[in-house]
Amino acid sequence: MASIIQALPTEVVYLITAGEVIDSLASVVRELVENSLDAGATRIVVSLWPQQWRIRVADNGCGMNLDDLQQAATAHSTSKIRSSADLWKINSLGFRGEALHSLTTLADLEILSRPVDGKLGWRISYGNGGKVVQVEVTAIAPGTVVTVSNLFGNCSSRRQGLPTTAQQMKAVQATIYQIALCHPHVTWQIWQNDRQWFTISPARTTGQLLPQILPQVRQGDLQEVKLEIPNPPHSPLPCTNAIHRVSPHSALTLVVGLPDRCHRHRPDWVRVAINGRMVKTPELEQTILSAFHRTLPRDRYPICFLHLAISPDQINWNRNPAKTEIYLNEIIYWQEQITQAINQALSISSSNLKEAVHTTRVSKLLKAAEAKGGYNFNPQNPKEDRKNPNSLKAVAQVSNTYIVAEHPGGMWLVEQHIAHERVLYEQLCDDWQLVPVEPPIILYQLSLAQVSQLQRIGLDIESFGEQLWAVRNIPAPLQQRDDCAEAILELSWGGDLQTAQVAVACRSAIRNGTPMNQQEMQTLLDNWQRTRNPRTCPHGRPIYLSLEESALARFFRRNWVIGKSHGI
């Protein structure tokens, strides 16, 4: 009996492989652009003709000589790795050697290239399977131009199964945005149907680039942190970052939207990149969301971009052809480092203190004042207190609600209740203490669910008669309050321990409308500045408003042209 299991023909194997790598216009752009970045390009031009299923990517990278061009589209040919050991030393975006060969299976491929030190450029057209069908000399600047035409022309069903043109262009734009965030030093020009679609200008840092991609976010709404962190144990290889510079440590770049200024309705801007590539890592994304917990309003999500440049032996890229999913070693170690970096970014210190005119109304006032005056504004650096450049000095209390504080760089307005709430909440998170009460607090007509909830958060509660319950210990901050029974009843309505801690902090914090003397205000300010997340309360409300010296000078037109203020 003949065997029913047979080896697949080579062309069928190639079609299967091509389908794994190239599945859309966006995947073509991704593969070609990554080749450009691996070639050291600092300027990339992407041209698209979606109705013609045609894509062109031009770059100013190192280029290829004739021998490399003739080999470029051969199956599994690459300049990135040589042996299986190199799979643990990958410092490039590509390494499989599949993309160009897959394109010859699914489309018409043409490459023009000239090496930086070469005098001649070459144009090569490839046939099915990566065979060279035409070679000629061409005039071209150093770099490479790859043109893909008639994509999926031999697979009409593939075209029919793809989304609409508008959706595909949206996917292309998202792909380029993701890559640009990982490589902020690159200039991008994107054309569609011979018209310029959008551009991305280079920036020194990702934080400076992000407002080009998210126009609704201002530069002042972001905080960027760059850290060198030790490599985890058992990581002998040096770290290589996205632009191929060897470093003895791993590097962490973090850009966060300050929670008192910007956030999202969806978790669509929690992004993680590793060694120059955006990846899907649910464990790290959840770490980011957890670090922002109790800093944002309800049902809101952070803006956060994390880029790790780590030793390649910590990563296994060989998980799927698109390389968007990885196996990451020592993941608990990286989660700890990320949490610490986010806490540092959200803290208030002299290094990250910025002008923070939070409301649109205040901004409009400043602009109006500036527009009406014919003065010359030259911002001056205020003299800072070198002993404690970030100190706040309580000056006064307004409406028994807001503390006016003087800062070396300007003036702050702090709401006393939510500042105290943040202090108490972090104290409760660090040390959830239950203290005995005598006599016990008697509660009436609790349901079994309410009793179970109080027991879940650690309270000692027992039946004290028909429809009566005795609570014999309570959270420490509540023991001095007259409304302790009401607070315990509120805790019984559900939620986890953290929800209970928020409720206790809110109940125990000083109420708005309460007079405070100078020493009490100063103590509160000192304690609040030492919290881990001083920008918002546990419910996500902003705690303070800052008016920096430069903003005040603008509003009061303090820097006039000489003689202007005297009518000369």
From Swiss-Prot:
The keyword Isomerase does not apply. Gene3D superfamilies: 3.30.230.10, Histidine kinase-like ATPase, C-terminal domain, MutL, C-terminal domain, dimerisation subdomain, MutL, C-terminal domain, regulatory subdomain. The keyword DNA damage applies. One of its GO terms (biological process) is mismatch repair. One of its GO terms (molecular function) is ATP-dependent DNA damage sensor activity. InterPro entries: DNA_mismatch_repair_CS (IPR014762), DNA_mismatch_repair_MutL (IPR020667), DNA_mismatch_S5_2-like (IPR013507), HATPase_C_sf (IPR036890), MutL/Mlh/PMS (IPR002099), MutL/Mlh/Pms-like (IPR038973), MutL_C (IPR014790), MutL_C_dimsub (IPR042120). Keywords: DNA damage, DNA repair. One of its GO terms (cellular component) is mismatch repair complex. Disulfide bonds: none annotated. Belongs to the DNA mismatch repair MutL/HexB family. This protein is involved in the repair of mismatches in DNA. It is required for dam-dependent methyl-directed DNA mismatch repair. May act as a 'molecular matchmaker', a protein that promotes the formation of a stable complex between two or more DNA-binding proteins in an ATP-dependent manner without itself being part of a final effector complex. PANTHER family: DNA MISMATCH REPAIR PROTEIN MLH, PMS, MUTL, DNA MISMATCH REPAIR PROTEIN MLH1. This is DNA mismatch repair protein MutL. The gene is mutL.
